[in-house]
Amino acid sequence: MIPDVSHALTWLEAHPKALKGIRRGIERETLRVTADGHLASTGHPESLGAALTHQWITTDFAEALLEFITPVDGDIDHLLTFLRDIHRYTARKLGDERMWPLSMPCFIEAEQDIELAKYGSSNIGRFKTLYREGLKNRYGALMQTISGVHYNFSLPLEFWQAWAGVTDEQSGKEEISAGYFRLIRNYYRFGWVIPYLFGASPAICSSFLQGRETALPFERNGKGMCYLPYATSLRLSDLGYTNKSQSNLGITFNDLHTYVDALKRAIQTPSEEYVALGLKDGDRHLQLNTNVLQIENELYAPIRPKRVTRAGESPSDALLRGGIEYIEVRSLDINPFSPIGVDAVQARFLDLFLIWCVLADAPEMSSDELLCTRKNWDRVILEGRKPGQTIGIGCSDSRQPLETVGKALFADLRRVAEVLDGSESASYQQVCDELVASFDDPELTFSARILKVMQEKGSGGVGLELAEHYREMLQNEPLELLTEEQLSAERDASRQRQHELELKDKLSFEEYLALHGGQ
C-alpha cells in the first residue's frame, strides 16, 4: 500500500548530516471576537501597527482575521516561542477582545457583518482589498473566515547535494524542484494522515450553515451545533474552504514548467460565471478581473510549492527563476489544545512526514489521479474515525484498513526519527510513539477529543471557554524572545513603511488596476 522506502531509509541512516539545517516557518490565523464570541466590528488595532507592512502581525481575508507570521527558523522550540511572544503581545493589545481558538467561526449572524481587510490608501493596499472583494463575491465571505495554520518547510542544500548530486541551488534548481514535486505528489496520496491525527473541526455552529443546502448527514445537539460523529476536519470538506470551479484546471505536480503553465492559464482564462458577475456595479469594483483565478494565490490547494518573490514578481515567475525554495503545508486546523494554535508534536510530525514524502517513490500523477486522491481525503475528513475505515490506493478499487496503512507509515517515520534525533535526543521518536497509538484508538485524535467536550458544551461554548482561558494565560506570560521595545519599534516602522508606500504612488488606482489587475 505505501511505497517501499527501505533503500532510501538505509541511505538516510548512512547520511545523517543531510538533515541538519531544516528550515521552518509558521503562519497562524485567528479571528478577533468580543467577550460573547461575536466577530469584532472594530478595525485592526492601531496598537498592532499597519497590517500591510508589519513583518509578524497582519490580517488575512477580514479586518477581524489576524494572521501571525514567524521568521524562518532552524529550531522548533525557538520558532514556537517566537510565535507565542507574538500572541502574548497581541493578547495585551486587544482590550476586551480575544482570539477565537477554533478553525470554524461561530457567532456570525450575517455575511454582511464581515468587513474586508483594509490596508490604507496606497494602490497596493487597495488592490489587496479589491482581491478580497472578489473572493467575497465569488465564494461568499463566511467561508473566508475559516482559520488554519500553515507550516513552511525546506530541506537544507546539504540534503540535495547528497540525495540529488547538485552542487548549488541555482544550477541544481531542476533537481531540487523535482524532489519537492515528489514530496507534493506523496502528500496528495498520503497527507490525509494530517486531518486524521490533527483535524479539530468535527462540528460547526448551526449558524455557519445559514440556510445553505448540504448533503452531509449532520447530527445536532441541543446546543446550536451540527456535527458528524466520525468527522475530523469539516474545515477541509466542501463545506469549508474548497473551490469546485478549480477542480478542472488540470494542474499537476510533475514538473515546474507544466505546473506554472497551468497556473498561468488559470489567471488568463475568463470564467463564464465570473464574467456574468461583472467587474463593476456602478462605480464599485466587484473583482480584480473575470478570470478563473484573479491572482495565483486564489488557487485552493492543501500544499503549495513556493519561492520568496522579489519586488513586482508573481509567485510563478519566482518559481521559474529559482525553482522551488520551500513547501507550504495548508492542511492543519487550529489546534484548540494550544494557546497558539499549533504545538511541537505537530511540527515534529510534519518534519518526519515531509522527509518521508521526499524519500518515497512517487510516480507522476495525471490531473485525474489527483482527483482520485481527493476520495481518500474526503473519507478521512468526513468519517476518518469510523470503526473499520478503509483507504483506497490511487484510482483502483482496492482498499486497505486505515489502521494498517497508518501503522506501516509510522514504522518508516520512526526510522527517520532515529536519524533526526541522533544520539542526543529522543524527541522525534517520542512523537512517533505518541501518535501511532491513535490508529489503535481513534479516541486519541484531536477531533475525538474536542468533539467529546463540544457534545457537552456546544462548539460555541467550547470556543468561548478556551478563548477566555488562553487570553488570561497569554496576557500574564512574560515575553521570552522579543522585547516590548522591538515590538513597539516594528509597530512604528510598519506605519512608516505604509505611509511611504502611499506617498510613492504615481498612478491613479484605475491605472494601477489596468496594469496589474489581469483584466
UniProtKB/Swiss-Prot annotation:
Coiled coil regions in record: none
EC number of the protein: 6.3.2.2
This protein's record includes keyword DNA damage: no
Protein name: Glutamate--cysteine ligase
Extent of the signal sequence: none
Pathway: Sulfur metabolism; glutathione biosynthesis; glutathione from L-cysteine and L-glutamate: step 1/2
Record HAMAP family: Glu_cys_ligase (MF_00578)
UniProt source species: Yersinia pestis
Source organism phylogeny: Bacteria, Pseudomonadati, Pseudomonadota, Gammaproteobacteria, Enterobacterales
